[in-house]
């Protein structure tokens, strides 16, 4: 009996040591980053796909069930998920992932956001008081977040600190090399005049040195009217653009209309993992984004 007891005790101790951190990611980019940094010490789940608008998700029972079992919540923050995440946290009853707990990680807490409104006026559309939250379009910002996320994993799973540190060092080296390659490949894109559908590309624009000529949405998050689009056509006669960009999850109707009226190229960029069939991980996401922009800028 004593041998059986000791055997069971050793078994459960072994299971505890090998236990994985259960990560609930709000968006695919954070699930992918968690996998890069956590390796076989984590299990991951993404609440959204690359073809969903993360602003508008329902806190459905299946998501609540997943969040109940999470050890770590990895989300964008800065009000991106404000329409559903607070309800999810509350319904989960999981103290580990409540705001302020070590198990709640918001990526935008670790970078400097732009686009902070001078005044809050909801009549001006879907604006974010904390600033533009779409930081995953910049590999520079993503690396900063990665370092912070690695430190959080080490805090939560101190028995495996050396493992997470090694994963971070490896990722940092590969990511810096890839970022340099992307910048070299995209050199010809500097100054490229573009039209965007929504202000979710600002960090990509800053990183690549693109020139934003116009935005299809007169008010953020509000689909452009025919009058809005006609005003864009008039504007483009004075300041021409070469490409109109929308995210893969967005309707292409407005971009298609503008292309038909003006003849400028249009492109759907993946925006995140799974935005198209080529963007299967973080590295391929930026590979494909650069490739698409170069192709449409010719």
Question: Language-model features: where?
Answer:
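Extended rod-forming repeat segments used as scaffolds/tethers
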Residues: 9-10, 88
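Sec-dependent signal peptide recognition
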Residues: 2-9
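N-terminal signal peptide c-region/cleavage motif recognized by signal peptidases
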Residues: 13-18
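Extracytoplasmic metal-acquisition and chelation regions
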Residues: 20-298
